[in-house]
Each structure stands twice: as structure tokens, then as C-alpha cells.
Amino acid sequence: MAEVLGEMAGVVARITVQVGDQVSAGQELLVVESMKMEIPLLAPIGGTVQEVRVAVGAFVQAGDVLAVVEP
């Protein structure tokens, strides 16, 4: 299991995957907007998206678990 963590505080701008999607390592999973920048969060491993724990518009903190990918 690989958790995708927020890198900095911000607002979820978009989610580009759904639970059950197959993803490759390095694939964009979601984008967080912080200080007028968009920060893409990428899959750390290839596998299946098991959880997406946030919704568009949600405020997140650095270190929050935003998604989970299983190999």
C-alpha cells in the first residue's frame, strides 16, 4: 500500500482518478492549489487506486493522506 500525502496546505483543485482505476508510477492523481500554484500529486507506484479521501474544494494540510494506491 502506498499513501499519497499532501505536500503543502492548499485546496484540492481537481481529482483525475477514481477508486478502482489502474495507474502507473508517476501518473497524476490529483492537483492541489496553494499560493496560486497548482501542485500535481503523483502515484508513487503503479497499481490500483483503493481510496480517494478528499473531494474537490477540500482544504488539506501537508502530511494528510489524500489517496491510497495498492500494487
Task: Please identify what each model-predicted range represents.
Residues 50-51, 67-70:
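Short alpha-helical linear motifs
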Residues 1-11, 31-44, 71:
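Short beta-strand-turn/beta-hairpin segments enriched in glycine/proline and small hydrophobics
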Residues 19-29, 56-66:
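Short, well-structured beta-strand-loop connectors
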Residues 7-8, 14-18, 51-54:
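Short histidine-centered loop motifs in beta-beta connectors
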Residues 6, 41, 54, 59-60:
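Generic recognition of well-ordered secondary-structure surfaces with a strong bias
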